[in-house]
Amino acid sequence: MADSTSMDHDGEQRGTKRKRDAGAGGSGAGIGKGTSNYVKEGYGPNMSEMVPRNIMNKGNHTVYHVVKQQKYLDFNYVSNQNPYIIPYQTAGFWASMWDQTDIGSNNTINIMKALNNVSVGVTWIKGEITFEVYAVTRQRLLTGTTNQTTWDFETSQNMFIADADREPENFNLATAAATGPLAQQTTQTLLFNANNDRYTKYELPQRNQYTREYDFQQLTNNYMWKPTDISAAANFRRLIPMAEGVYTTTAATTKMAELTEQKSVYAGSGKTTEASLFRNRTSYPRMHMAQPQVPDETGYMKFRYQVRMSTKLHLVFHLYPDYSTSTNIEYMGRQVLELPEVTATGGVVTCMPYEIKT
């Protein structure tokens, strides 16, 4: 005989229990059964589910948002064959800070700004950079001349991506323009020297997409990053979630300092929050876009690459509770950390190719 408690019927047979589901309809609706973890609200048949709005639990009351941008770039190696630096370590790189003219028309950036205003904190999930080479041209001397040049399409020529993943490197961060992919070229001319093993090179063929993903460091114990308009030029010194190593130029015993500074004191906290207490030290190698250094009659071959670059920045915004007031916002802010920031003087981003666990 079948188990009466597992039979799916409405009680036609005497001695069996009527099944009560939490769905709509019937006198058993909304009794509190079901598989959800939501809080029940209401009375009797009108009882409905309500999402708990507990600001101490980051899993609730959140909005997932992706900041997207797409640019067409001209990597020009005619006058300078040195590699370009892709400054993805800067927060402004992910929100077109280096191209202020296009920010206003980018709705994903505008949504990010709006969410910043209603959020107590932000969790950075990951970033994606996709490159696609759609045209390559080469400048060369016109046949039979010594000063007349022409341009040829090089359909078989590829571009190169190189990571400085065997030694620390750095780049300057003096202005908002320095957060752009066309702002800085390196001084190292030997990236493709046969004896150079400091860099790992990847070849990027034409009409192929190359995507790089960066998983950002996750804070623990409900700590969050402070909502910041990373498209504003005033915040150009801000970096993605990280901790950096420091060049020790004085002595081997010089302290390794965090580049994260917590400058604002929240009411009731009594002292500033030391961000280094909650994070391991991690960083990212310096990234370059380069051409092959092949000599010709004018020195090195002079290529120009037309590249489509698209980025995606995955963020989770932790919204204020429904009934937050100006007096308790500061209290909630005790678990919010400032994004890392380079100093105003010097302005050097140190790119560490390895992690330092503490």
Curated annotation (Swiss-Prot):
Record carries keyword 4Fe-4S: no
Q: What is its main location?
A: virion
What are the recorded Gene Ontology BP terms? Answer: clathrin-dependent endocytosis of virus by host cell; symbiont entry into host cell via permeabilization of host membrane; virion attachment to host cell
* Localisation: Virion
- Identify the keywords attached in UniProt to this record, alphabetized: Capsid protein, Clathrin-mediated endocytosis of virus by host, Host-virus interaction, T=1 icosahedral capsid protein, Viral attachment to host cell, Viral penetration into host cytoplasm, Viral penetration via permeabilization of host membrane, Virion, Virus endocytosis by host, Virus entry into host cell
What are the boundaries of the region Disordered? 1-37
Composition-biased stretches, type Basic and acidic residues, lie in 1-15
Q: Give a GO cellular-component term.
A: T=1 icosahedral viral capsid
Query: Gly residues bias located where?
Result: 23-33
Record function comment: Capsid protein self-assembles to form an icosahedral capsid with a T=1 symmetry, about 22 nm in diameter, and consisting of 60 copies of size variants of the capsid proteins, which differ in the N-terminushe capsid encapsulates the genomic ssDNA. Capsid proteins are responsible for the attachment to host cell receptors. This attachment induces virion internalization predominantly through clathrin-dependent endocytosis.
Protein name as it appears in the record: Capsid protein VP1/VP2
The organism is: Aedes densonucleosis virus (strain GKV 002 002) (Aedes densovirus)
Its gene? VP
